[in-house]
Amino acid sequence: MYYFSGFVLFIFLCSISAQQLVGQTRTLHISTIHIQQHSKKPLASVRIATYNNGAMTDAAGHADIFISNTEQAISFSKAGYIGGTITIPASSNDTSLTFTMQPMEFQGKAVQVTGDRNSVYGIASQDVNIIKTETLDKHRGQTLGETLKRVTGLHTLQTGPSISKPVLRGMHSQRLLISNAGIAQEGQQWGSEHAPEIDAFSIGTIEILKGAAGVEYGPGAMGGMIRIIPPDIADTAHLHSSITLQSQSNNWQGAISPSLSWGTRFISNDAFGLRAQITAKQAGNARTTDYVLGNTGFTELNGQLQGKYSFSSGESIQFTTSSFDTELGIFKGSHISNASDLLRAIELGHPLQEYDFTYDIDFPKQQIKHRLLSIQGTIPIQGLGLLEATYGWQFNDRSEFDAHNLRVPKDSTFLLEQLLVKPAMRLLLETYSGDIKLKSIQVDELISATIGISSQFQQNKRLGKVVLIPDYFMTSLGAYVIANMMFDDIIISGGARFDNRSISIDRFSTPTRLINDSVLNYGGASFSGGFMWQVLDHMRLAMNIGNTWRPPQVNELYSYDIHHGTAQFEIGKRDLSPEKSTTLDIALLYDTHNISFDFSLFHNQFDGFILLQPDRARPTITVRGSFPTFRYDQVQSVMYGAEFQGDYTVDDWLTFSLQGSMIRGDNLTTGNPLFMIPSDRISNALHAHRESFLDVFGDAFIEFRMTLVRMQNRFDPNLDYTNPPPGYSLYDINLGGTILHGPLKGISANLSFQNITNLAYRDYLSRYRYFAMDTGFNCIVRMTIPIL
């Protein structure tokens, strides 16, 4: 691990020292313009790079770069925008050049046939959605899963109001990779109630890659990838500071998140910047329409520090380090001491006792600490392309606490408290990762390529009485190649990857359970290919087919104990084989200045699909109480569906949006529907926006949204503990703007009203739907105050 990081640093330093200017040079003046609808504005902080030089545009969108009097390929890129490459012939006498850049809009596809998509995403024909900073600002303070719910095809697996896990086209956890600051987020993500340990206040941009992404990102991206990009660090001399405040009425949550950004430029035109942010949150018990959900409060304390040094010659090195700490209560109504009360609670559908509002967090509960360090370096290499190296380290400390212990007499309160104060299960996960890729390799005039290698070393240690998974050490290695062939109106893409994973399991023995020392080895290949065709000026057709695999995870093989967060007893299966998937995605995109839509079809065929499903006939009775039993199994299955998203804008200020998704999942082994497949849903919104409203508010908006969720009528009645809940309709209002004048000038605020009818409902993907309803009406106030 340490040798690998040293090797990456050695390659980085040697490549910098090898850069030489060739021949005579001249100065090229570059301007960058931001195009959105009918406006053209200068665009700052655009990275301009040749094979041996580079620059960053200033606030006016200008930059000067030295180029040799030979043929030059100049690339331009900026997070959230479609980049590209242009070739300057040796015979050119041009002294100025203008780049026009289009933003990757929220829900819009970041696809343009004339752009160099390989330098951004790898497989150019894949389906990509972008959530920009401006949209994220309107949802700060919610969980990552809640923030993502408005993306078509994305749902959330909810475990109470504080735990929300993204589900993309029916897949989550081991099949959906979440990348944070350039490295895969590793934090016991196999648990359905283990939400990503990411501070939503510190996110700059979110990119959602739909469909099989295993070629570039490995087996964990079988169902797609969610890429979390921290805020930009400006390469200009600056000092900025702001404070974001947020409050919610349902659980009386309060949050504060101050940030500070500083940057400078040196005489050499090198640039250095730092950004720091701290977030604190506290929330009490959440409320449904009729009652309080006992012990659902939580606290968070998070921090993030970023730094970036950009060389005038085009190289850069940056780091991100973050700390995430949370303590959250687990709904008391889900932990029940005996089998009869468990069945009665499921039959009643509401808690067996009433609770009052409080900020106190009692047992059962979870405490999670997550530390992350990411170091990334980029180097343009003459005649090859752009070399990127990433080193990552993460440490995850998860403690889960019991609420019951039947071995202790009911009148021995002191003894019970002494036992419960220690975690029933504590998991310590440390992960090292290293990735090197060479991208934008210009094979010839039409073909560009990316090659890369990746590695990961992971160790898991267990403490406590509960032994859900054993101790293990895991090594993963992978190598891949991706190529894009670009014609005038079509891009053809393809790629291949091979991975090997080795898992060493430590011996474990109890009177009822034995795990011997063992080494598990898995290997497999992934392939992907497709095209993006510019059918008309405003219409594009994309198709992608991928074949991916993933090895079984340790929890799927060895689980045999209580999983406290989900309040269920989970049993693994040791003879599971690798899971394989063949995915077909087709998307039609249409985009003009006032009408845009995106229609997608997808089909996933699984060989050896690994699933966790209830064994309703045999609830498990333990000394900690009675719990529903869930078992891992492997079947043949298929998932398929359709998604639609469209916008119609009237007079550039009023927009009507419509989006919907439908997914079907079938267990081909039994002939029954798959368990926990998201329900069909349709959402439509009316959004009004003004650059200036009454000369008081700038960027003012108001939005009314209605979401319709259909009852899931495709289920196996002999499998689950209760039938799916009825469908429901939710109505939300969101409004806000920025104050233009006076002592409060520059303050941005928005107000959200969720579930304004205070509807009593249950979502099929809620882990607590057996015991309680979802939350009722909620009012959210957000305010960002600029300090410097």
Tell me what each language-model feature is.
Residues 187, 202-204, 215-290, 296-303, ...:
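Outer-membrane beta-barrel translocator/receptor signature
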Residues 96-100, 144-147, 162-167, 179, ...:
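N-terminal periplasmic accessory domains that precede
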Residues 415-437, 571-577, 583, 592, ...:
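Outer membrane beta-barrel strand-and-loop segments of large Gram-negative receptors
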Residues 263-362:
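Periplasmic-side early beta-strands and strand-to-turn transitions of outer-membrane beta-barrels
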Residues 602-605, 623-712:
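Gram-negative outer-membrane beta-barrel transporters
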Residues 549-550, 605-608, 612, 708-715, ...:
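C-terminal beta-signal and adjacent terminal beta-strands/loops
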Residues 35-41, 47, 77-81, 94-137, ...:
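Short, acidic, small-residue-rich periplasmic hinge/interaction motif at the N-terminus
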Residues 63-66, 183-210:
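Short acidic/polar hinge/loop motifs at secondary-structure boundaries
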